[in-house]
Amino acid sequence: YKGAPGRECEQANRLDPEGIRAVHRAYLAAGADAIKTNTFGLPRMAAAQDPEWEALADAGWKLAAEAAAGTDAAVFADLGPAPDTEGLSAAQVYTAVVRRFAALGAKNYLFETLSSDTGVLDAVRALRETVPDAFVQVSFAVLPDGYTREGQHCRALVRRMADSGLVDAVGLNCVSAPGAMRTLVQQLGQVGIPLSVMPNAGYPVVTRTQVQYR
């Protein structure tokens, strides 16, 4: 999806809804049995107290749900990293966002590309008060050496999620290419809950004015 209008990708939910629907439908046509809302940046927007974030959450959920209607595909409310700010903690931000999605009817939640687990379990506890049967997946962005950009090792992060009793699936995504991620997963071993793996297609290489993954 190129040429997204607005300063944030999520703004396309309102400025180009048909374009976002087309992306969802393309995944479904390719055989996807789950899609995620175009809302990765909402926690960051909520932390900055951007007045648009709630409307973008609503629009993002509606577009994904409409695209999946009439299929067996699951729809995941997608949440990227939430920063701690002077005004709001990561836990407060995540909690506000998941409660918004819960009010819209979301049953599946994906916290992804995280460098730490700060605030995640607090938000999941709050979510389960409203949606006790929610499916929650948490995924960390880990470098090939096993550490996130905040210096936390994936083994400790995955173990905390698996041992919490609050998370249904845990895993790794982004940053590392398939070979490196395979090695990390082998090092993790059995974790007791389903393990998700979503590697990068490769590593970005800038050639003149283009970015290619190799």
Model region roles, listed by residue range:
Residues 1-214:
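Domain-level signal for soluble alpha/beta catalytic cores
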